[in-house]
Amino acid sequence: MPKTTYHIQLKGYVGGEDFDRKSVDSLLANQSGKRVNVLIDSLGGSLATGLSISAAFKQHGDVAVHFVGLNASAATIASLGAAHISIDAGAMYLVHKCSMAFFEWGSLNADQFATLIADCEKVKADLDKLDQNCAQLYAARCKRKPEELLTLMKVGGWLSAK
């Protein structure tokens, strides 16, 4: 079996150096009109960047993504725009509900708590929308119902190639 040549290797944090939309666009431009083989090895990162890279793969057309190692979160979303997705026999793939960093320190009075609760309810509603969007993307790719994928995301377990 011939060894695959990877035109793009995306490793590390999605949204970090060499794993952002600008870098991917530049690398895809060098392969205009050609099949592009992409290796992904990432525990995830920025959902916004993952969605953007997915769109870049879809716009390019003939993109094949291959996962190695442990892959999660935004890295899995980035792959969804590829024409073909494969996973190494020993690799793992994690889908989970979206999350957001939350830091609140100090003492709060009743009014401040009310404001904080309202802010948290808004964040929860936004996260629910992001979860629905991701579930729809995964579901379209694997030809399942979004509700099934949302349940899988809620569990947040690692999936193997099997």
Enumerate the predicted regions with their spans.
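Terminal-region recognition feature
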Residues: 1-162
